[in-house]
Amino acid sequence: MATILIHNEENTLLESEQEVAAYLENQGVIYEHWDIAKLPNRLSEKYDLTDEEKDEILTVFQKEIESISEKRGYKSQDVISLSDATPNLDDLLQNFQREHHHTDDEVRFIVSGHGIFAIQGKDGVFFDVRLNPGDLISVPPHIRHYFTLQEDRKVVSVRIFVTTEGWVPIYEEETV
């Protein structure tokens, strides 16, 4: 289950499922929690995946992917894996942490590990959505954000795209 840290004066932490869901809905961010128990144990917490294993992950969650894709018009998906074994991980993370937006939704489903989306709220205040296995998030178009890893520095996620080309980041001049 995701948690949210709001970067206001109080550094408000939202931890209950109801609080998280209500806050994200108010921000226009889609949040779902999929049944991660469907994932075969041999793929849980595995970060060096073969193409066949990535395809298997997509097959395991095919119904959920098809459901959200039909509702939102998504056309393609892939699986990415990041860990300390990933070549140039620090360079990749530095690039991911550049604040940007897209002209379409940025959708991720966390399979293993953890990730953080830092998102600019409607009031201009940033908040971190700390994602765990089973969490799906869809950041709406034109919302400033960035993605990074949590302290464990590893994640396997399904990325779902509006186009077959994937997202095109539009970087901002101002830093977050």
Curated annotation (Swiss-Prot):
Which terms under GO biological process does the entry name?
A: L-methionine salvage from methylthioadenosine; L-methionine salvage from S-adenosylmethionine
Q: Where is this site: May play a role in transmitting local conformational changes?
A: 105
Give the keywords, sorted. Amino-acid biosynthesis, Dioxygenase, Iron, Metal-binding, Methionine biosynthesis, Nickel, Oxidoreductase
Q: What cofactors does the UniProt entry give for this protein?
A: Fe(2+); Ni(2+)
What pathway does this protein act in? Amino-acid biosynthesis; L-methionine biosynthesis via salvage pathway; L-methionine from S-methyl-5-thio-alpha-D-ribose 1-phosphate: step 5/6
Keyword Metal-binding (UniProt): yes
Record site feature (May play a role in metal incorporation in vivo), residues: 99
Q: Where does Fe(2+) bind?
A: 100, 102, 106, 145
Residues marked Important to generate the dianion (site): 108
Q: Which family does it belong to?
A: Belongs to the acireductone dioxygenase (ARD) family.
Subunit structure, as described in the record: Monomer.
Protein name (record): Acireductone dioxygenase
